[in-house]
């Protein structure tokens, strides 16, 4: 039986494409090329974060913003205090960040997604209903109590809801120094410039009055 022979040039091309496109996709942020690179936030960001500060100290690797309490007196009853490269420059190029999330009783961190990172959240206080949606519209959810954790795959829509009678607090961690957040309600109904009403009425199978009412709630 004849054996299929793959031309060596074609094989080399395939291996090159694999190295260029598949291997980098296994990580989120790029790997650092030095021990650390404390971000100079006064400079413009580049592809892999901020340029390095010329002089650093222990204070650059310290952050005190993960404590509480936070003010949750807003329509959603939630406040998120991020510890990412923009607030904690020592994280620059290290591929990690955290959030301090506090929810009032009944408070909701509305459906959102992080385009650049996987998230793992741990409840510190209270009881939080956490859920994410897969690409086939399946809801995966769990009520978390103190000391319990839940992972949210990268780029999937998810939310947190305080189902307890007292405040709840979570610490969330990401495999990116700046995971980004697309909050669906404010993105769809509070964008600048606005998404045309005709698009939203058709997408949500509703009428122009309802869409305009929703837009008014997210107008800045």
Curated annotation (Swiss-Prot):
Residues 1-27 form the signal peptide. Pfam families: Cupin_1. CDD domains: cupin_OxOx. The keyword Manganese applies. Disulfide bonds join 19-37. Keywords: Apoplast, Disulfide bond, Glycoprotein, Manganese, Metal-binding, Secreted, Signal. Glycans are attached at residue 136. It comes from the Eukaryota. InterPro entries: Cupin_1, Germin, Germin_Mn-BS, RmlC-like_jellyroll, RmlC_Cupin_sf. SMART domains: Cupin_1. GO terms for molecular function: manganese ion binding. It is found in: Secreted, Extracellular space, Apoplast. Mn(2+) binds at residues 112, 114, 119, 158. GO terms for cellular component: apoplast. Residues 64-212 form the Cupin type-1 domain. Belongs to the germin family. Oligomer (believed to be a pentamer but probably hexamer). May play a role in plant defense. Probably has no oxalate oxidase activity even if the active site is conserved. This is Germin-like protein subfamily T member 1. It comes from Arabidopsis thaliana (Mouse-ear cress). The gene is GLP1.
């Amino acid at each position: 039986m004849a054996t299929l022979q793959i031309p060596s040039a074609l094989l080399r091309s395939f291996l090159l494409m694999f190295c260029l496109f598949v291997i980098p996709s296994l990580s989120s942020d790029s790997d650092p090329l030095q021990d650390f690179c404390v971000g100079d936030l006064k400079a413009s960001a580049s592809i892999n974060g901020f340029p390095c500060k010329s002089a650093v100290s222990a204070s650059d690797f310290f952050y005190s913003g993960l404590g509480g309490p936070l003010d949750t007196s807003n329509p959603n009853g939630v406040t998120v205090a991020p510890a990412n490269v923009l607030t904690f420059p020592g994280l620059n190029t290290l591929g990690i960040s955290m959030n301090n999330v506090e929810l009032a009783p009944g408070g909701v961190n509305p459906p959102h997604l992080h385009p650049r990172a996987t998230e793992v959240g741990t409840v510190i206080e209270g009881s939080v209903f956490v859920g994410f949606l897969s690409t086939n519209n399946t809801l995966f959810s769990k009520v978390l109590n103190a000391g319990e954790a839940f992972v949210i795959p990268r780029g999937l829509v998810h939310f947190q809801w305080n189902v307890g009678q007292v405040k709840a607090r979570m610490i969330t961690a990401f495999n990116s120094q700046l995971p980004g957040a697309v909050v669906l309600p404010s993105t769809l109904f509070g964008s600048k410039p606005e998404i045309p009403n005709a698009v939203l009425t058709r997408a949500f199978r509703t009428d122009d009055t309802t869409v305009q009412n929703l837009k008014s709630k997210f107008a800045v």
